[in-house]
């Protein structure tokens, strides 16, 4: 009985610290500049999706392992599409932020758009979370990864390098962490 009480107290202490599984951040948050091409009206060989976990663009005709894709609708609006919009399951989410890119320090836990297109413009700031991933140190508990992106340019023309969005994206690939600042996250 004494050991049970000690175990309960230890678990409570770990949970009170804000990281219930005691996972340590190991990977520095990284910012990359990315170009995606519209799902429609561009060669199929160009990447239209982005995987947060891989920190890489994805050719959507080769794989569905991406967290969001880019397209341009018939009205000429630039769209970011979470997986639910593409009937791939509601596994990732996006939300527009009113804060400047550099001011966002931590990802919110709610109010993500899971199943409809997000209209973006030049300078839009978006917060995203990924499909759930099981990390080695998480004891089998799946976690999403978080990211923030800042739209740099959108080209809606049909020129050879058009129908494209360019953005900078900062990704946090640490299980259980939502920190969106450069370096190893603390929260």
Question: Model regions: which residues?
Answer:
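Positively charged n-region of N-terminal signal peptides that target proteins for export
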Residues: 1-4
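Surface-exposed, beta-sheet-biased, low-hydrophobicity segments with strongly acidic/polar composition
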Residues: 17-187
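C-terminal motif of bacterial Sec signal peptides marking the signal peptidase cleavage site
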Residues: 12-16
